[in-house]
């Protein structure tokens, strides 16, 4: 893969030229060659162009891991348009913020999501909502994934397959793109908890894809399984863009059912994948999973949530496959620190934590003090990162960009140490952000929902260690005088208003929340052993 390619489109065109008949996508029993994928994305790009979509326009994608996601990526990039990653689990209030902030002109959504997506888009700049079905591009209809073999009704605005069929054999106008052009808007959270759109450029993605391809030793004929969701930066870049541009096969299974993932490893002879520790924990619990399923696995990476050494050991003992740590952020276009393939990460003797790895090529990592000065090896400070993977900023948010990326160097907000060999260890987070299975949850957002309940007087949300998810969301509330509310009632209330990974798994009703003399809630005390008041 040539990182010097002018854009992702140029890199993709080179891959098609090298091996047009090579398998680019596998989806259950379906297969799409590079040439076929190129034609499908050409037709979709031409359809979008005919409807006025052009350079710089934003289009939301609200899908699971299905071939249409990749078709849309390539089509939008061919137009110089920007893909806005939208989580299919988002509820109306969450989705509406992404729509309004990005100024999306259109949305490609799963057909089952149309009613909720239409409600979120009402009164915004969205001109149309196009739908598609995960049943397409395969015939197996695995009942573990598909509960019905009949697609949901299409959007009144149209169906993706129909748009592609209408423009079959057509191409969009040629467009010259550069490394600095934005390819993705991937939303993260800022210090206030408000989601911000990180502007992942063609150059950012090319650099990460080229680095990861070389780092993982990807070869033509390898198969990479996308277990990380493509609406997450890791899924979009490492699990999708990297194999697509590296002349390997991207294997997709819609959503992560652990038994389906295990079967896919054997069926498609998976060599590499990157997912959260939750996925690997779930795989470990599959009764029939055996070492034979993972015989082809050469490189397994886990990112998002911390990975305990005991989990790595147990997986290696049972399946013969070692899980490597990898570290990245939306602002770093995914991976920037990782454990080299075939190398076992050291464990910090002081904390017992597994190293997240070494800085990848072209990445500069420093541990700094509050003034931005580099600290000696072994001292704790904030992890700062720089390199061609760092995004140029946040969409329409120069103030947050200046705070988080002064001089183009990313202040991660993570407390870390680095040893003399360059191994990095995460000690703690400077922020209150909660990591649930690799998904980021901000306490304030959950607290705001709790405050909508008529009985809640005060609320505080913290992350608690969870062997399965990495961390779980836990809430503490005090109630208004004369009001009552149960844990079950409050959980149900938040579950209706937040994505599945965001709502609290436990809610403790206590008399008073612990506070400082200035009235700030002492979250550290709440992270101790929970006690009901």
Segments predicted by a language model, with ranges:
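ANL superfamily adenylate-forming
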Residues: 116-179
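Conserved AMP-binding A3 loop
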Residues: 33-35, 174-175, 183-207
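Conserved AMP-binding/adenylation subdomain of ANL enzymes
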Residues: 206-223, 231-272, 280, 286
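Conserved AMP-binding/adenylate-forming core of the ANL superfamily
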Residues: 4, 21-66, 70-74, 91-96, ...
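Gly/Ser/Thr-rich phosphate-binding loop
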Residues: 270-274, 284-350, 364, 374
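Conserved pre-ATP/AMP-binding loop-to-beta segment of ANL
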Residues: 21, 151-187, 194, 217-223, ...
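AMP-binding/adenylate-forming catalytic core of the ANL superfamily
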Residues: 90, 107-109, 387, 392-393, ...
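Conserved ATP/PPi-binding loop(s) of AMP-dependent carboxylate-activating enzymes
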Residues: 358-362, 371-403, 441
């Amino acid at each position: 893969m040539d990182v010097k390619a002018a854009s992702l489109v140029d890199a993709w065109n080179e891959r098609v030229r090298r091996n047009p008949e090579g398998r680019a996508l596998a989806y259950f029993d379906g297969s799409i060659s590079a040439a076929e994928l190129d034609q499908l994305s050409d037709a979709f790009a031409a359809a979008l162009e005919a409807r006025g979509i052009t350079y710089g326009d934003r289009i939301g994608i609200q899908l699971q891991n299905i071939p249409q996601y990749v078709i849309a990526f390539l089509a939008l990039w061919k137009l110089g348009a920007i893909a806005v990653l939208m989580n299919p689990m988002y509820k109306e209030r969450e989705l509406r913020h992404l729509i309004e902030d990005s100024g999306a002109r259109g949305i490609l959504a799963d057909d089952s999501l149309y009613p909720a997506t239409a409600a979120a888009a009402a009164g915004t700049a969205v001109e149309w909502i196009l739908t598609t079905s995960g049943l397409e591009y395969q015939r197996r209809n695995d009942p573990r994934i598909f509960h019905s073999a009949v697609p949901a009704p299409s959007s009144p605005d149209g169906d993706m397959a129909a748009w592609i069929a209408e423009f079959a054999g057509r191409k969009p106008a040629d467009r010259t793109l550069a490394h600095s052009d934005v390819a993705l808007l991937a939303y993260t959270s800022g210090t206030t908890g408000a989601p911000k759109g990180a502007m992942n450029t063609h150059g950012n993605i090319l650099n990460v894809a080229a680095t990861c391809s070389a780092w993982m030793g990807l070869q033509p004929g390898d198969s990479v399984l996308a277990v990380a969701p493509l609406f997450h930066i890791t899924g979009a870049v490492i699990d999708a863009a990297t194999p697509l541009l590296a002349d390997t096969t991207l294997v997709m299974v819609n959503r992560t059912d652990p038994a389906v993932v295990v079967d896919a490893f054997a069926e498609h002879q998976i060599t590499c994948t990157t997912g959260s520790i939750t996925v690997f924990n779930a795989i470990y619990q599959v009764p029939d999973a055996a070492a034979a399923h993972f015989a082809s696995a050469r490189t397994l990476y886990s990112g998002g949530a911390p990975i305990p050494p005991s989990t790595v050991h147990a997986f290696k003992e049972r399946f013969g496959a070692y899980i490597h740590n990898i570290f990245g952020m939306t602002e770093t276009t995914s991976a920037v620190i990782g454990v080299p393939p075939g190398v076992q990460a050291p464990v910090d003797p002081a904390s017992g934590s597994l190293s997240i790895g070494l800085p990848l090529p072209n990445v500069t990592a420093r541990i700094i003090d509050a003034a931005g000065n580099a600290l000696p090896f072994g001292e704790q400070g904030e992890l700062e990162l720089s390199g061609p993977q760092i995004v140029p900023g946040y969409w329409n948010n120069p103030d947050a960009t200046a705070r988080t990326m002064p001089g183009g160097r990313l202040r991660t907000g993570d407390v870390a140490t680095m040893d003399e060999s360059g191994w990095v260890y995460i000690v703690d987070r400077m922020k209150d952000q909660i990591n649930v299975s690799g998904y980021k949850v901000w306490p304030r957002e959950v607290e705001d929902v709790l405050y909508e309940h008529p009985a809640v007087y005060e609320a505080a949300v913290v992350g608690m260690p969870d062997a399965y998810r990495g961390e779980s969301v836990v809430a503490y509330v005090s109630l208004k005088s004369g009001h009552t509310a149960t844990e079950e009632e409050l959980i149900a209330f938040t579950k209706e208003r937040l994505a599945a990974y965001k709502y609290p798994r436990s809610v403790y009703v206590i008399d008073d929340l612990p506070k400082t003399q200035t009235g700030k809630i002492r979250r550290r005390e709440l992270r101790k052993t929970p006690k009901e008041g």
